[in-house]
Amino acid sequence: MFINLNPLEQFSVYSATSAILGSSSNSLAITSLTNIAILFIIGLLVLTIFQISASSHLIKPTRWNIVLETWVASILGIVKDQIGNDAKNSLIYFPLIFTFFSFVFISNILGMIPYSFTPTSHISVTLGLSIAIMIGVTLIGFSKHQLDFFSLFVPKGTPLALVPLLVLIEFISYSARAFSLALRLTANVSAGHCLFGVISMLSVSACMAVSSILLKGITIGLPLAVLVVLYGLELLVALLQSYVFTLLTCSYLADIVNMGDH
C-alpha cells in the first residue's frame, strides 16, 4: 500500500495553539512546537561546538578537533578580512559571527534530512535574524560614533541641495539590507528543496502510471540518480549560503566599525 507523504510538508507551518488545542481557529502563534524545539536543538548544537572548540587542549588532536579548529579559523579569517586585523575588534565580534554562521549552516544541513524541518526556508526565521543583525549594527554605530553615525547617510562632498534626497536614498538602502539578507537566504534554500520535492513527486507519479517493470525501474532509477547529484549540490549550497550570510553580516559591521577610517 502506497503512503502519500509530501516532501514539501517541511515548508508547512502549524500554529502552536492548534497543536495544543486541536483547533486551527483563534491561532496566537505562527511557529509550531516542533519548529521551536528544532531551533532550540540547533542553539544547543552551536553552543556545544563553540564550547568544545574553545576548551580543546589536546596534544594530539582528533579529527573532530581538527574540523572544529578549521571551522573556527575560517570564520576568524572572515572577520579579520572584513572588519580588520585589529585584535580587539576580532575578539569582540568573532563570537557573534561564529554563532550566526554555525546557526545558519546547521539549520541548512538539518534541512537536508528527508521530511525534516528547514528553519532557514521560512522568512520569519531569516527575517528575524537579519532584523536583529541590523538593529545590533545600528546600536553599535550609535555607541561608537554617537551623532557622527548619521554621516553614514551623507556621502562626503555632497552638494547641500542634494542632501535631503541622498539621505532618503541612503536610509532606504540601509534599511533594505535586512530584507535582502533574509530573502536571499530563504529563496536559495527553498529553491533547492522545492526542486527535490517536484522531482520526487513526478518520479512517484510516473512509476505508478506505468505497468512495465522495466519502465518502473527507469522512472525510479533516473530521477534517483538526478536527486543524488542535486543532493551533493545542495550540501554545497548550504555551506555557500552560510558563508554569504556571514560575509554580508561582517560587511555591514565593517561599515559601522570602520566608518571613521573612510
UniProtKB/Swiss-Prot annotation:
Record GO terms (molecular function): proton-transporting ATP synthase activity, rotational mechanism
Segments passing through the bilayer: 30-50, 64-84, 91-111, 123-143, 149-169, 195-215, 220-240
Range of residues in the leader sequence: none
Cross-referenced InterPro entries: ATP_synth_F0_asu, ATP_synth_F0_asu_AS, ATP_synth_F0_asu_bact/mt, F0_ATP_A_sf
Location of this chain's protein in the cell: Mitochondrion inner membrane
Chief localisation class: mitochondrion
Membrane topology: Multi-pass membrane protein
UniProt superkingdom: Eukaryota
Keywords attached to this entry: ATP synthesis, CF(0), Hydrogen ion transport, Ion transport, Membrane, Mitochondrion, Mitochondrion inner membrane, Transmembrane, Transmembrane helix, Transport
One Gene Ontology term, aspect cellular component: proton-transporting ATP synthase complex
Record family assignment: Belongs to the ATPase A chain family.
UniProt cross-references to HAMAP family, sorted A to Z: ATP_synth_a_bact
Assembly information from the UniProt record: F-type ATPases have 2 components, CF(1) - the catalytic core - and CF(0) - the membrane proton channel. CF(1) has five subunits: alpha(3), beta(3), gamma(1), delta(1), epsilon(1). CF(0) has three main subunits: a, b and c.
NCBIfam families (alphabetical): ATP_synt_6_or_A (TIGR01131)
Task of the protein: Mitochondrial membrane ATP synthase (F(1)F(0) ATP synthase or Complex V) produces ATP from ADP in the presence of a proton gradient across the membrane which is generated by electron transport complexes of the respiratory chain. F-type ATPases consist of two structural domains, F(1) - containing the extramembraneous catalytic core and F(0) - containing the membrane proton channel, linked together by a central stalk and a peripheral stalk. During catalysis, ATP synthesis in the catalytic domain of F(1) is coupled via a rotary mechanism of the central stalk subunits to proton translocation.
Protein name per its UniProtKB record: ATP synthase subunit a
Lineage of origin: Eukaryota, Fungi, Fungi incertae sedis, Blastocladiomycota, Blastocladiomycetes
